[in-house]
Amino acid sequence: GVRLVGSEMCIRDRFKLTPGIFALWYLVTGQFKAALRAAAAGLATIAIGFAAMPTASWEYWTHYMVTPNRLGGLTWAGNQSLSGLLLRLEHGNHTLVWLVLVALCCVLAGVASRRLWQGGGADQVWSLLCAGLCGCLVSPVSWSHHWVWGSLIIVAGLADRRRCQQVLALIWALATLTWMVWWFPAGHNRELAATWWQKILTDAYELVGVATLVALARNRRRCESGVSAPRT
């Protein structure tokens, strides 16, 4: 039940690192008990892993976790992360630029998530969606099928009466349902030869993801319904 909030998320994180962003989301939104449970559950699962397979666990945490290149094909259009975007722009060392973008993205998502959470109601759903987008953006590898958050934004936006959220839903529908990231030749580093406008469409998820965070972080009041309040 309620006592498992945070623990379940961090247990999932130990099996797959992508949900780990939500442990930070608990902190940003002031859900401190859930954050503590997430931290405790995470440390417990790591300890169990070391007890069961010490050598494999050590290799994973000290080597494999920090070497995404082991997955191969990181310039592939299917890698819809900020790192993938940079690799397709300049096929070389982009670590410093990536770290700066990751920091900015985390701040942006944190501001948006906190403001939306404090708004209560449907805004708390959008707060969670901001965390999901941030996780996909900052991960070194985010395959296109990780971007289920786009589908959730479509559903949430169409169910929301506010114009900003509805526009975001339409933009995400255009980006995802048209499969525009696959419109051009992909694989075997063919993405590197694409023109600038082809790269923009190929990196649709990252660009729309950042734009969504900006729109929601500016001020949640600006995403209110376009209907004016009655004059007195």
Q: Language-model segments: which ranges?
A:
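Internal amphipathic alpha-helical segments of the cytochrome P450 catalytic fold
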Residues: 1, 20-21, 33
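Aromatic-enriched
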Residues: 158-232
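Transmembrane helices and adjacent periplasmic/lumenal helix-loop junctions
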Residues: 11-26, 138-146
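Primarily membrane-embedded glycan-assembly and transfer machineries that use lipid-linked glycans
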Residues: 29-147, 151, 155, 192-198, ...
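Active-site catalytic microenvironments for nucleophilic, acid-base chemistry
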Residues: 26, 155-156, 160
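Short hydrophobic/aromatic segments of transmembrane alpha-helices and their interfaces
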Residues: 7, 17, 126-127
